[in-house]
Curated annotation (Swiss-Prot):
Pfam families per record: UPRTase (PF14681)
UniProt keyword annotation of Chaperone present: no
Hydrolase is among the record's keywords: no
Protein name: Uracil phosphoribosyltransferase
Protein family: Belongs to the UPRTase family.
Cofactor note: Binds 1 Mg(2+) ion per subunit. The magnesium is bound as Mg-PRPP.
Lineage top rank: taxon: Bacteria
Entry-linked PANTHER family: ADENINE PHOSPHORIBOSYLTRANSFERASE, URACIL PHOSPHORIBOSYLTRANSFERASE, CHLOROPLASTIC
Cofactor dependency: Mg(2+)
One of the GO BP terms on file: uracil salvage
Lineage: Bacteria, Pseudomonadati, Thermodesulfobacteriota, Desulfovibrionia, Desulfovibrionales
Amino acid sequence: MAVHVVDHPLVRHKLGILREDGISTSRFRALAQEISRLLTYEATKDLATEAKTITGWAGEVEVEEIKGKKITVVPILRAGLGMMDGVLDMVPGARVSVVGFYRDEETLQPVEYYVKLASNIDERIALILDPMLATGGTLMATIDLLKKSGCTNIKGLFLVAAPEGIEKIVKAHPDVDIYTASIDEKLNDAGYILPGLGDAGDKIFGTK
């Protein structure tokens, strides 16, 4: 497993705007999608390609096309949907798998309430989408679910991540790569990332 911080001037600039208190819903959505495109660029660097000959304007030309495993994007409801369009802009042929969890108030553990996975999930590369990797509990449950379904090539894409969540995933799933725009300072007592983004779901959907 590797943790990849996508350290780029455009990413840092856009993330800085995302952190602003009072940012509009439309602006937050747009920036979340823009950063998601850049995360996808990094997360797909290792896709296999093969040569192909096509007819260009001046005759035949050899080009490359992506081959091998197909991709499924896996937004975690609901906030992960805010990253989905940006990722699909980069990999428009990807299938969409959706998972949803709620937290049990007694055990504080994630409980699955919705799952719809792409066909042939065992033959696909899964890109899990969630704006924030905080405690790692929901991500852990998502990875477990995908692996039980036969998926072995899994990556997670996050706008920001907390060290605590990263450590948890590294220990439990060393074969899963994490891509994030920032590793933030820590979690507060309520489990929010500091400095973080606040409630990304509310900011994406305009709710409170």
